Every structure is written in C-alpha cells, then in structure tokens.
Amino acid sequence: MARIQTVLGSITPNLLGRTLTHEHVAMDFEHFYKPPPADFQSELEQKISMATLGYVRLYPYSSKENVRFYDEEALEASRKDVLLYKKHGGGAIVENSSYGLKRNLEFIVDLAKTTGVHFIAGTGHYIHATQDASHKNLTVEQMTDLYSKDILTGIEVNGRMVKSGFIGEVASVYPVQEFERHSLLAAGEIQEVLGCGVSLHPHRVSKAPFEILRLYLEAGGRANKCVMSHLDRTLFDMDELLEFAKMGCYLQYDLFGTECSYYQLNSAVDMISDGQRIDNIIKLINEGLVDRLLMSHDIHTKHRLTSYGGHGYHHIHMNILPRMFQRGVTLDQVEQMTVTNPANWLSFSA
C-alpha cells in the first residue's frame, strides 16, 4: 500500500493536500554570507528594519542576521508563516534541510503538531563545504547506512523516533567533488532499495543538472522518483530545458517570490521573475509535461518571511495560482502540479 512518511508518522497519499516541495523552516545559511559592498556596509550590519530592508533585498547574503535562519526570531517568524500557509489552503511542506544545513527536527515536529500542516523531513548531504568534520570522509556505504537508518528507524526527538520521508536536498558544486559524488551515488542506491523520493540541488551552471542526474541514475536511482531543484536559476534556455526533461525526472521551479536585479549567488545571470516562471511552466505544460512539474519558494532567509517584509509560504497559493488561471492554466493542471505530483513523488510502498 502506498504511503507518505511525515514526521508524525505515515499517511496515505490522498491526505497530503496542496504541497510545497522545496522549503526550509529553519536552517543555517551562514556559509553563503558575502561581505557587503563598502557603500552599504553600515546598513547591512544593522538589524533588519524598514530602514534597512531595501538594502537586504538587494544584498540578502550580505546581512548576517538574514542568513541566520535558525535563531528564535526566525523560528517565531517561520511559525507565523506556516500558520498563514495553512489558513490559505496549504496541506504539506517538504522540508529540505539536510546534513550540512543544521536541520532542526525538534522544531519541524513541533510545527507539524501545532499547525496541522504535514511535514516531510529529508536526509542526505548538502555540499561538501558545509559539512562537519565527522561527515566529510564518509564512504558511499556509510552514507547509504545513514540514509537508510534515517528513513527506516528515524532519529530520536523528545522520546519519539522521527523518520525522514525522502532523501534531500542532495547538493553539489560543479565540477562535483568526491564527497558529493558519494552522496549522489548513495542516494541512487538507497532509492532503488527503498523506493523513496529524492531531491537534487544542482550547482548554478547549465551542465550541472545533467551531470548529477546521470550519477544518480547510474547508481540505480529511478528518474521518476527524483526532483531536479532550482531550474529557474539554472536552465534558462527552453531547448536545453526540454533536452534535460528527456531524462525523466521531476522539473521543479522553486524560487517563486525571488525577484531581484542582482543575484548574489551567481552574478553572471539575471534571476527570472515570477511572471517568467509562469511563462516557462505554461510552455512545459504545452509540451505535455504537466505530470512532472513542481513549484515551491525555497525560503531560506529571514527577509522572505512576512515578519521581515517578505512573501511567506502562502505566496504561490495566493498570488501565483490566480495569475496562472488568468493565463489559461486549468484547475486540473494546477491540482496535478500542487497535489498529485508531490504525492506521487513522495509515495513509496511499505
């Protein structure tokens, strides 16, 4: 019988509801801090306020407060926005904080209990540079043992075992480092055995999605149980995107709400707008790919939460879906992308 493994236990796929497939509710993004431009240093070193928010929106990774997405203020703001997401029809959130991002399972479990939103926690490894020394030299076999334990046995949180429901996000740079190659191979091996979903994070070059999906597939992982994240900042050319789509994985646009004139994590490209994301998704729907499309926000900094002037986890439901309907996307197609596809990806047989 198909099931989905949440942090509070297994549920049947029909109970999942509208789902955000790539989010964070608490994590440490300080590794990506970038020194602020000299002209704006004083503003970006202050606490986030109406007086400094404009600078933070332009240089989000140059505010130390902004990338500390784990302190008490961040947790309170995150909780508020999860409740807003629930209020506006949200059913589930897939929490992608893996090893290297300091996931907070205790907080995730508490959110699931107190908000009524289903939470699915991930296992797996983020990029090599974010790992603790105890993880940096793990072999493929040790990684497969760890991921299997997280999914089958779980981790103790306040006296109860909390199980991961998928592997992700599994992240890499380009070219892929040896540690990251190990984590991709381990993800593929465990997926083949357990039938779980997997979420991959490519580096910010167009060759990266092809390379890491190939490694995962060669290890035995199934394409139809794998999500390629962050395509809206990685594959800009539609022909190249359609070529990648032939590999058979889920195609995820997960930076909805991120609209900026300067993308700090890759200044060589221009970040697309929500309108362009919608246009691309419609093109993919017209290519017959609606059964492989997913959407999310990848919230990982404070300034994207409503308490800090951001859009929150309900942005897609309240602002994007209405625009899609205006452009001719049908209710059935929206349900496919936001309900059916997430459930199919996350489901595995007992």
UniProtKB/Swiss-Prot annotation:
What name does the UniProt record give this protein? Phosphotriesterase-related protein
The answer to whether UniProt assigns keyword Metal-binding to this entry is yes
Task: Determine the domain of life of the protein's source.
Answer: Eukaryota
Q: Which of the seven top EC classes does this enzyme belong to?
A: hydrolase
Residues noted as binding a divalent metal cation 2 in the record, renumbered to the chain: 169, 201, 230
Q: What EC number(s) is this enzyme filed under?
A: 3.1.-.-
Q: How is the cofactor bound?
A: Binds 2 divalent metal cations per subunit.
* The species this protein was found in: Drosophila grimshawi (Hawaiian fruit fly)
Binding site residues for a divalent metal cation 1: 22, 24, 169, 298
